[in-house]
C-alpha cells in the first residue's frame, strides 16, 4: 500500500515531566557565506507550561519514513542513515587522552565516513573533525563535551540540545568522565 504525505512536518519535541526544569539550551549549527561551520543559534528554549511541559526544538518540512513492524532496523551495520533515511544512535565519548590525540591521523574521521562525507569545508581542523550529509538532532544525556566547529568551540553538557546542519564538527571530550549523546541523523541533500 502506498501512502502519500503532503506537507508533512517532522518535529523534535522534548517532553519534560519535572516541574523545576523550565528551559533547555539549544545549539544550532549552519554554514556561513564562506562555507564555514558556525553556531547559528546558541540559547535557551523555554518549555511551554502544562501537564507535560515541552518545547519544539527544530522542524523540517519533509520525511516520509516507511514503517516496519517486523524488521529490527537497529541491527543494520551503519551509523549513517541510508539515502532518504534516518538513523537513531547513542554514542559514548570517553575522555580523550592528549597523547593519543597527538598521534591521530589528521583525516581519521573522514576515512571512517568515506564517500558519504561531503568534500566541501576541507581541510579539517582536528583529526576527529567530520561532516556528514545529514541533519543531526543531538541530546547530551550525561557528561559534557566540546563541539569544535570551523572557527569556534561550543561546550555542551547534559540536557543541552544540538542541531547540526551538515556542518564540519568534532566531538572532543577533554573532561575526566564519559559523555553520552543521543543522535537522530536525517539524510539531507548536499549542502
Regions found by a protein language model. Give the residues of each.
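Bacterial N-terminal signal peptides
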Residues: 7-17
Amino acid at each position: 500500500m502506498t501512502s502519500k504525505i503532503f506537507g508533512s512536518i517532522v518535529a523534535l519535541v522534548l517532553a519534560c515531566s519535572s516541574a523545576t526544569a523550565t528551559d533547555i539550551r539549544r545549539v544550532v549549527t549552519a554554514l556561513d557565506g564562506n562555507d564555514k561551520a558556525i553556531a547559528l543559534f546558541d540559547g535557551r528554549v523555554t518549555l511551554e507550561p502544562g501537564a507535560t511541559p515541552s518545547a519544539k526544538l527544530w522542524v523540517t518540512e519533509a520525511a516520509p519514513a516507511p514503517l516496519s513492524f517486523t524488521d529490527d532496523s537497529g541491527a543494520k551495520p551503519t551509523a549513517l542513515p541510508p539515502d532518504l533515511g534516518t538513523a537513531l544512535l547513542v554514542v559514548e565519548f570517553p575522555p580523550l587522552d592528549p597523547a593519543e590525540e597527538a598521534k591521530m591521523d589528521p583525516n581519521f574521521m573522514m576515512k571512517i565516513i568515506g564517500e558519504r562525507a561531503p568534500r566541501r569545508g576541507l581541510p579539517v581542523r582536528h583529526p576527529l573533525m567530520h561532516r556528514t550529509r545529514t541533519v543531526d538532532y543531538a541530546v547530551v544525556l550525561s557528561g559534557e563535551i566540546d563541539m569544535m566547529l570551523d572557527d569556534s568551540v561550543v561546550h555542551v553538557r547534559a540536557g543541552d540540545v544540538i542541531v547540526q546542519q551538515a556542518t564540519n564538527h568534532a566531538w572532543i571530550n577533554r573532561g575526566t568522565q564519559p559523555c553520552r549523546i543521543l543522535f537522530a541523523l536525517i539524510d539531507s541533500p548536499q549542502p
